[in-house]
């Protein structure tokens, strides 16, 4: 893993955005894996501020709630339109269909689509319990796109987007860990002290289903971008190297 520790959350978002921008610039066709939740919002704002040309980019999102139509205000389809797609046109954009009549069949369809496209770069966040996408603790490390039941901690974390906890869906369609690992490059962003324990396990623990993000250690092209709070439980030597790496990142681009 290549770990960068930025001074602020905004700097961490800027690093991740810059990496994405550099990868897609000048390419004829590019497949970009996108995420939802609070982590990527600042980056999507940067896409809009720069009017980044994504006309040659096909996007695939990690997951979608089951039971919500694409136009439901809390669906991830609506999230992506409101925060990115309505202002930054992509060549094509794909998400799982949350209101598909057969979620299992939809998961299989989406797995096939993602595999055929081939993801060049996948953007990730990480949950407090170490989940990536909706791969909760206990998910098989070789899981493909599947239907998953959300843990109470994940539903509670997403409660802020709904009127009541009871309104938060209980299931979702998510890319599996094996699906994510098939991306050519991965950029994971984590900020804030609430993510510190999960980040520590992701980097320092042996790969385990108890902390799904630990599987990323086996990927040859992972960049982890943190702020100081998210890195605070990692070894001091790693924090120091990460801070130096973040400083170099900005210096060579000035």
UniProtKB/Swiss-Prot annotation:
GO terms for cellular component: cytoplasm. GO terms for biological process: carbohydrate metabolic process; glucosamine catabolic process; N-acetylglucosamine catabolic process; N-acetylneuraminate catabolic process. The keyword Hydrolase applies. Its EC number is 3.5.99.6. Keywords: Carbohydrate metabolism, Hydrolase. One of its GO terms (molecular function) is glucosamine-6-phosphate deaminase activity. It is an enzyme of class 3 (hydrolase). Pfam families: Glucosamine_iso. It catalyses: alpha-D-glucosamine 6-phosphate + H2O = beta-D-fructose 6-phosphate + NH4(+). It comes from the Bacteria. The active site is at residues 63, 129, 131, 136. Pathway: Amino-sugar metabolism; N-acetylneuraminate degradation; D-fructose 6-phosphate from N-acetylneuraminate: step 5/5. PANTHER family: GLUCOSAMINE-6-PHOSPHATE ISOMERASE. Catalyzes the reversible isomerization-deamination of glucosamine 6-phosphate (GlcN6P) to form fructose 6-phosphate (Fru6P) and ammonium ion. HAMAP family: GlcN6P_deamin. Belongs to the glucosamine/galactosamine-6-phosphate isomerase family. NagB subfamily. This is Glucosamine-6-phosphate deaminase. It comes from Exiguobacterium sp. (strain ATCC BAA-1283 / AT1b). The lineage of its organism: Bacteria, Bacillati, Bacillota, Bacilli, Bacillales.
């Amino acid at each position: 893993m290549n770990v960068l520790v930025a001074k602020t959350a905004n700097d961490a978002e800027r690093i991740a955005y810059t990496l994405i921008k550099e990868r897609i610039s000048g390419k004829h066709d590019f497949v970009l894996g996108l995420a939802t939740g609070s982590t990527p919002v600042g980056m999507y704002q940067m896409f809009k501020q720069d009017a980044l040309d994504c006309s040659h980019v096909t996007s695939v999102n990690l997951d979608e709630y089951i039971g919500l139509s694409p136009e439901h205000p809390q669906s991830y389809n609506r999230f992506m339109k409101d925060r990115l797609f309505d202002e930054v046109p992509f060549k094509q954009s794909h998400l799982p269909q949350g209101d598909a009549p057969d979620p299992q069949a939809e998961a299989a369809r989406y797995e096939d689509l993602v595999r055929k496209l081939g993801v060049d770069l996948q953007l990730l966040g990480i949950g407090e319990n170490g989940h990536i996408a909706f791969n909760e603790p206990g998910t098989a490390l070789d899981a493909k796109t599947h239907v998953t039941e959300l843990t109470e901690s994940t539903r509670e974390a997403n409660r802020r987007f709904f009127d009541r906890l009871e309104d938060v869906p209980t299931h979702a369609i998510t890319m599996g860990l094996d699906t994510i690992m098939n991306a050519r490059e991965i950029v994971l962003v984590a900020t804030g002290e609430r993510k510190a324990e999960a980040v520590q396990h992701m980097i320092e623990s042996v790969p385990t289903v108890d902390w799904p993000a630990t599987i990323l250690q086996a990927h040859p092209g992972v960049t982890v971008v943190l702020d100081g709070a998210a890195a605070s439980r990692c070894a001091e030597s790693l924090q120091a190297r990460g801070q130096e790496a973040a400083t170099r990142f900005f210096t060579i681009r000035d």
